[in-house]
Amino acid sequence: AASDVYKRQQHDALLIIDEIQAGMGRTGKFFGYEHFGIQPDIVTLAKGLAGGVPIGAFLSTKKLANTFHAGDHGSTFGGNPLACAAANAVLTAIKAGNLMDNAATVGDYLITQLKTLQQSFPTLITEVRGKGLLVGMELTKPGRDIVNDCLAKGLIINCTAGNVLRFVPPLIITKDNVDTLIAILNEVLPKYID
């Protein structure tokens, strides 16, 4: 991270970080970038910011914000009262419910359980990676059919890049929920072993 900051300063470039999916406590910290000891010039937020109500945010350092003048940055729908109220409620819920701590704790548990699962299926699962409740499990095969089989058993997951199962559960997930997720994967995965 330090070398990236040096390059940014050397080339007088802005560091813009997209926190649209990784932000709002999902990784166990409010912003995902906080895990890496860097300070961006601009951060973008959306999705989790208002719990499903459409909203986006553009955050910048004070130094950069002072370069904006009236009309430089605007939005046709900016400041929508409903969306802003929803965002305020989400921020309150994250703090009051200790959801960042839950994301960190249960996320670590999820990653540990998925790595244990990897030991049971080493020819199918090549890697488990992530932070908090933003986790990927890379497979040696396409994951679409696994996703469909899990869905038939009540587990909603996604497959990205063709062979990476993505786990992005709600911030209120419990260890019991993770145990259920692992049990379903233990039922589904044997069918995909050669």
Descriptions of predicted regions:
Residues 3-194:
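Conserved N-terminal phosphate-binding loop of PLP-dependent enzymes in the Aspartate aminotransferase
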